[in-house]
Amino acid sequence: MRPGFVGLGFGQWPVYVVRWPKLHLTPRQRKRVLHRRRLLTDRPISLSQIPIRTGGPMNDPWPRPTQGPAKTIETDYLVIGAGAMGMAFTDTLITESGARVVMIDRACQPGGHWTTAYPFVRLHQPSAYYGVNSRALGNNTIDLVGWNQGLNELAPVGEICAYFDAVLQQQLLPTGRVDYFPMSEYLGDGRFRTLAGTEYVVTVNRRIVDATYLRAVVPSMRPAPYSVAPGVDCVAPNELPKLGTRDRYVVVGAGKTGMDVCLWLLRNDVCPDKLTWIMPRDSWLIDRATLQPGPTFVRQFRESYGATLEAIGAATSTDDLFDRLETAGTLLRIDPSVRPSMYRCATVSHLELEQLRRIRDIVRMGHVQRIEPTTIVLDGGSVPATPTALYIDCTADGAPQRPAKPVFDADHLTLQAVRGCQQVFSAAFIAHVEFAYEDDAVKNELCTPIPHPDCDLDWMRLMHSDLGNFQRWLNDPDLTDWLSSARLNLLADLLPPLSHKPRVRERVVSMFQKRLGTAGDQLAKLLDAATATTEQR
C-alpha cells in the first residue's frame, strides 16, 4: 500500500483515511466509508478494533509498474507458493535429486497461512511429523504441563515460521539450486512480477508446480462472511490478545479455530459463563493420544489403528460404525447427547475436551446471517445479544473441499493431499514419486488425491481412500522402504523396521495389506448403503 495511507477494509475495497475521495465508490460504499471515518473522529477507539487491510500482492489495489523489459531465467521446476506444502515438496525434490527450482510467493517469508495466523495458534497434531522431511521440527519432547501434557509437543506459530525460514536459508538456498522470489505475483504461463515491478519469464524444463491449489484460509485474510451492524465489535482471532476485558465473548464457528479461541479464553481465566459458542454443526474429533509417533507410543498407536480396522470390520451401518469408533476411542465429541454431522480432522486432547465442555451457552441454529446490536440472526432463527459483546469470527475455511484433479498433468503438477489431512507428508511423497517413477500414469495411480473432509460420511470416504492408497504403496518394496524412513509419515510405526530381514518384512507387509483390503471392502459396502439411503430421502 502507498506510504501515508491506511486501508479500512470492507469487502475487497480499501478506503483511504487521507485523500479518500480518489476512489470511485458506490453510494452504499461511500456511506460505509463515512461511518468508519466517524469512528475515528467521534468515538475514541483503538485502531486494533478496526479491520486493517494492508497492501501487498494479495490485495494491492494499485497495479505495479513494470520496470523495463522482462528478464528470462531457466529452471527445472517453477514452484508457485512457499507455504507448508510448497516447502515440503521442494525440500524432498532438492534432497533426492539434482533438480533446480524457482520458488515464488506472495508473502514476505515462507510459511503460507502461518505467516498471517493468530498469535496463539499451535499445531493440532504433533510437531514430530510436520514441516519438511529432511529437518525435524521441535525438540522431540513430551509436554509436561498444560492441556497437552503427556503428549508430543505442538509447535506454536512463531516456531513454525522460524522453522520454515531456517529450512529456506540454511538448507535450500545454500545448495545453489533454489532461487526464491518473495513478494511476487504469478501472472500465468511461467511469468511473475516482483514487488519492484520487475517481470520475469521462466523457461521451465520439467514442470510448473501449483502449491496453492488447496487454498488454506485463516480469518485475517478476509472480512467476516456475514453482515455486522455499525457499532458491533467483530474481530479476527489475531486481534483478541490486543483487546481488553469484555462482559461477553461470542465465538462464531466450531472448527479448529473456534476451539482454539475458546481454549485461549479459558486458559486466560475467562469464566465459561461469559462465553457464547455459535456452533452450526457438532463435529467428530480425533483423540490426539491415538496419533502419537515414536517408541514411547508405538504400542498404543498400533493398538489404536488396529481397533479402528476392527470397528470398520464389525460395523453393520454408518451409525453403528461411529458408535464403535467412539467406543474404541478413535473419535470424540463435545456433547455426548448431540450426534455430530461434521468431520474436519480436528484433533483434541482429553484435557482440552474437558475444558470445551465447560462452555454451556452453545447456539445450534445454523450459520450466522447477520449480527445486530441486540440480536444474532442465524439460519434457524435469532437469539438475543449483548450490545457490548465481542464477536470473534472463526468461520474461515482452513481446509476447503477442492475438487480432485490429476496430480501429474503433462508439464504441470498440482499438489494435493494423497493421505487424508496430511498435507505436508503428501507434498513430500509426491516429490519422491516424481523422481522415482517415469510414467505419469503410474505416478497418478500412486498419488490419488483425497479431498479434505467436511461431513461425517467424509470420514468413511477419506479412510476408504487412505486404505486404497496405502495398499498400492505397499505393493512396491522400494516405496515401502521410503515410507518406513520418512519423518513426515505418521504411519511409519505400523511398518516393520528396515533392519528386519527382507523376507520377514515382506511377510509382515503382506499380512498388513490383507487387513487393509478387508477394511477397505467393508467401508465400500457401508458407503454404498449410506449413499442409497441418502438418495431415497
Curated annotation (Swiss-Prot):
Coiled coil: none annotated. Gene3D superfamilies: FAD/NAD(P)-binding domain. GO terms for cellular component: cytosol; peptidoglycan-based cell wall; plasma membrane. Pfam families: NAD_binding_8. It comes from the Bacteria. GO terms for molecular function: flavin adenine dinucleotide binding; monooxygenase activity. InterPro entries: FAD/NAD-bd_sf (IPR036188). This is Uncharacterized protein Rv2000. It comes from Mycobacterium tuberculosis (strain ATCC 25618 / H37Rv). The lineage of its organism: Bacteria, Bacillati, Actinomycetota, Actinomycetes, Mycobacteriales.
